[in-house]
């Protein structure tokens, strides 16, 4: 197997403190134990993993492996959109939403075993547009979460004074009216936040869309309406497998527009490929995979099956994976993002 390991040695640090469960050397040793000897390329700046992944794919690699956190994985993935080259993940970050969604264990030996096994799937990628353009694997959206992510990024960088700003914002934030266009269908309603989810998780492991699947060719659009902040937090921190008050019955026809009222507020779930969000009473902040995106109006579009990935047995998939050898040389019908 010809492959490149893209390494971010700064992954797994929150607030300037190391909190990761492995190192790049652990990843290399685990891969070697499974007979995989990759070329190593280290990231030096933001966006560098995208360049390295694209170069590896063009050079003829069979697999590109990202060793780092969710940010490194997302950057490497962007470089492989539209390529037949699959992405493997060696989790070195503090949260690892993408690894969780793809069924990749945190243990380096177990993660390397997933790569060696070669189970492959084509997953969807989200594209967000507004004042900025961005791709996302987890979720995007607008509202209180987008406003708080800016503080979270400052805290991650060690600026602890941002904690107080985040607390003030959380206490003062009020629902705002939003206008959604979902594949052309329009709805207006009040919301604390709107998540356009490709997968179940975003940010610090928040379960923004428990039923979302990364290969079902639909976004799960979750609208969190007026409710106490504690109820919102409980909903986002809900344990895996517990659906809560809206339940499955609000999602029976997954091709359509769905949702129902929860007993502590309103949480609506919709399915759509193309989502536009506007705020008639002034702009709302947006994010893509917890990174600032600008403000409304924003558009989110889906690239179905745009990224080939190596997955574990517990991946959050709607379909079944196939072996890498049977994937074939055909690339998904999406253009590679411009450099």
Q: What spans do the regions from the language model cover?
A:
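Glycine-rich beta-strand-to-loop/alpha-helix junction loops that act as flexible
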Residues: 9, 67-69, 92, 198
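A generic structural signal for short beta-strands and their flanking turns/coil linkers
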Residues: 174-176, 190-192, 215-219, 271-275
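Gly/Ser/Thr-rich active-site loops/lids in small-molecule metabolic enzymes
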Residues: 154-161, 202-205, 210-231
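Short glycine/serine/threonine-rich phosphate/pyrophosphate-binding segments
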Residues: 49, 71-76, 97, 123
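ATP/NTP phosphate-donor binding region
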Residues: 1-63, 257-260, 316, 326-339
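Glycine-rich phosphate/pyrophosphate-binding beta-alpha loops
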Residues: 141, 145, 195-210, 292
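Catalytic core of DAGKc-family lipid kinases
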Residues: 32-34, 43, 81-193
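ATP/nucleoside-binding phosphotransfer catalytic cores, i.e., glycine-rich phosphate-binding loops
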Residues: 182, 213, 223-339
């Amino acid at each position: 197997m010809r492959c490149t390991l893209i390494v971010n040695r700064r992954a797994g640090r929150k607030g300037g403190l190391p909190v990761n469960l492995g190192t790049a050397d652990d990843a290399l040793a685990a891969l070697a134990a499974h007979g995989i000897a990759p070329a190593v390329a280290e990231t030096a700046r933001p966006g560098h993993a995208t360049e390295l992944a694209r170069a590896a794919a063009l050079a003829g690699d069979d697999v590109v492996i990202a060793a780092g956190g969710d940010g490194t994985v997302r950057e490497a993935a962007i470089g492989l959109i539209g390529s037949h080259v699959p992405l493997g993940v060696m989790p070195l970050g503090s949260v690892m939403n993408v690894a969780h969604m793809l069924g990749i264990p945190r243990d380096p030996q177990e993660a390397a075993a997933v790569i060696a096994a070669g189970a492959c799937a084509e997953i969807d990628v989200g594209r967000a547009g507004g004042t900025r353009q961005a791709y996302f694997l987890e979720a995007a959206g607008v509202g209180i979460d987008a406003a708080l992510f800016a503080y979270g990024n400052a805290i991650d960088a060690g600026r602890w004074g941002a904690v107080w700003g985040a607390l003030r914002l959380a206490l003062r934030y009020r629902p705002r009216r939003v206008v959604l266009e979902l594949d052309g269908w329009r709805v207006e309603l009040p919301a604390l936040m709107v998540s356009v989810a490709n997968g179940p998780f975003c940010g610090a492991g928040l379960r923004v869309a428990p039923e979302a699947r990364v290969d079902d060719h639909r976004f799960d659009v979750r609208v969190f309406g007026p409710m106490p902040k504690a109820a919102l937090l409980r909903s986002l921190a809900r344990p895996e497998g517990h659906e809560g008050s809206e339940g499955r019955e609000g999602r029976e026809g997954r091709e359509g527009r769905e949702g129902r009222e929860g007993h502590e507020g309103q949480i609506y779930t919709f399915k759509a490929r193309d989502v536009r969000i506007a705020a008639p009473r002034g702009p709302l902040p947006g994010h893509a995979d917890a990174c600032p995106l600008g403000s409304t109006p924003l558009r989110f579009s889906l690239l179905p099956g745009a990224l080939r990935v190596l997955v574990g047995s517990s991946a959050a998939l709607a379909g079944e994976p196939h072996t890498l050898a049977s994937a074939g040389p055909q690339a998904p019908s999406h253009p590679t993002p411009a450099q």
